[in-house]
């Protein structure tokens, strides 16, 4: 709060089936708690694991959010399939701006720090060799566990240990590598608030 960082609301619940029955309530509660703590409303929101349910956009609008950044225009088996959605920002009915996370137009692969770590630099050098497939607005998804190994790492289920253990100390290096690629293609870097305001002014 004192540092005046660009932060926005995120769901507390990460079990998507549990979230499904309480998403609207949780969006409003997140806004209320955020506003009370920061003294201003949250402009943006992120749903758990990139999953949106019918009615969520209307609930976001009703809770006063200007943008959502939940959608991966990609597929994650068992959770979502948003390959039919654009890889560039769009406006939902109801006036909420969607700032989708980066996915490649030709393959719909999600370009996240977690996926950079899972697949490795050599794989992504091949995937990213054609900038024409990159979204013009490149929103990078990341988590704290991409950069810092949790103290309870060894207590995680085996599947999580295998996934998170791949290149677990390389999060910062791989993000820096991606940023340099983007710089080389002329991308400029802004926070989510600035991006939201700039894009909404164009609509």
Where are these regions (language model features)?
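Active-site-adjacent pocket scaffolds in enzyme catalytic domains
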Residues: 40-141
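Distinct, well-ordered alpha-helical segments
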Residues: 1, 23, 56-61, 202
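Histidine-centered divalent metal-coordination motifs
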Residues: 8-14, 143
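C-terminal domain-boundary segment and adjacent tail
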Residues: 121-203
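Acidic (Asp/Glu)-rich catalytic clusters
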Residues: 1-10, 31, 61, 92, ...
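Residue-level detector of anion-binding/catalytic polar loops
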Residues: 6, 66, 188
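A short acidic, helix-capping loop that chelates divalent metal ions and anchors anionic groups
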Residues: 14-20
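An active-site-proximal "capping" alpha-helix that borders the catalytic cofactor pocket
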Residues: 23-34
